[in-house]
Amino acid sequence: MNSLLYALIKALRCHRWLRLLACAFIFSSLGNGLTQVVVFGLLLAWSAPPALLTLAFLFATVPGFIGSTIGEKLCSRWSPISLLILTEGLGLLALLFPLLGVGYHSVAALLAVQSTEALLSGMSWPALTLLFKRGLSEAELPAATCLENVIFASQVLLGTGLGVVLFQKTSVFTLLAIDAASFLGSLLMLWLAGRRFSAPSLPSSGEEEASAALRWRTLTVRQKRSLLLLPSLAAVGSPAMALLPALAQQIHPQDAAGLALPLLFARSMGQLCGPMLLKKESLTRFAAHTPRIIVCLGIFLASYGTLPLLSGWMACALGAIFIAHLASNILFAAGTFGVLSSFHLTQTASASGKAWRWQTLSASLFTGIAAAVAAGFGSVAALYAVSSAALVMVALIVRRYRE
């Protein structure tokens, strides 16, 4: 019973604030997933070109760079719970954008809600990581890693799952009303979690500033690898994930939305199940073993590469996406655990913010390249060329920083 799932269940039984926090983010993820269904479903229904579909993914990542910087700074002044409540409240207000998009048939408004969600996600990531570091013991950190993956996966597992069922059976306004209710539920759960959480005394501002100044030359090899794992995953994974709606449009133009949304659901199932295959003790060893990293990324890319060949085989296409994200989220779990376990408490917010920004830059760069290639040569060629080049680059980088 050393799996990450067992570690999470044990931690949830010990900490009431953690149970409330988990409920809050499940509510929030439900709303975020519904928002994604509305955005991509409308773009597909409006027959948006492949380059625009890919840029929609880009707009959902780039503002996270700014958000993580803001979140990192606010973590030194606000409690993590207060910052999380702020981001959820702003997320509720951001639902005005899709309302405008539907009312005025505005693609810009749909992209604006993607950008706002990315900004708020970037703000919340350092706060969430710092909250785990303060509230959990070192032995319980694998539980935090598992919970982060559950939060990440439930966005599509719950939100997109419900959206797949309801998108073509109910109005967009009904979906947005459910979305708003989920944000209100999240705000309530976060407020209750804040009342139950008791943090240790904070370090002095001078000590925190000194500790939080992360300089690359002074970091250990393990710390450097921890910061590089998530950007490496983004370099290989983001082009493929961004091209997924466009691939569906190219493979099955008669019913692109009917194919793309189940593929997104299969993606989330893989994201949820992948970390459950790991044991607590294997997290550190996995992050330090370069061949395992390359194998996971290779499985991810190979699975996506088979999609153009599976146009008439829906079940096989869903299975390929499931396997791809099973592999990628094993690596995601190793990366998030590395940031949590490799840095001191006063460095956690800075380290997680830096990892998020590097991940955002990596995703933005390679997604932008994929969009340009897709516009000129098609989404299939973009998938093979960009993600393969990224995989070679990642292999060279992780080999350079071997432990």
What do the PLM-derived regions correspond to, one by one?
Residues 26, 33-38, 172-174, 215-275:
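A single, central transmembrane helix in multi-pass transporters
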Residues 26, 106-123, 315-330:
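Hydrophobic core of transmembrane alpha-helices in multi-pass small-molecule transporters
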Residues 1-18, 196-228:
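Juxtamembrane intracellular "pre-TM" segments in multi-pass secondary transporters
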Residues 40-46, 99-101, 158-178, 250-251, ...:
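Transmembrane alpha-helix termini and helix-breaking/packing motifs in multi-pass membrane transporters
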Residues 60-91, 250-403:
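C-terminal transmembrane bundle of multi-pass solute transporters/carriers
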Residues 113-154:
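Cytoplasmic helix-loop-helix junction between adjacent transmembrane helices
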Residues 176-204, 399-403:
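Helix-loop junctions on the cytosolic side of multi-pass membrane transporters
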Residues 39, 123-136, 330-343:
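Intracellular juxtamembrane helix-capping segments at the cytosolic ends
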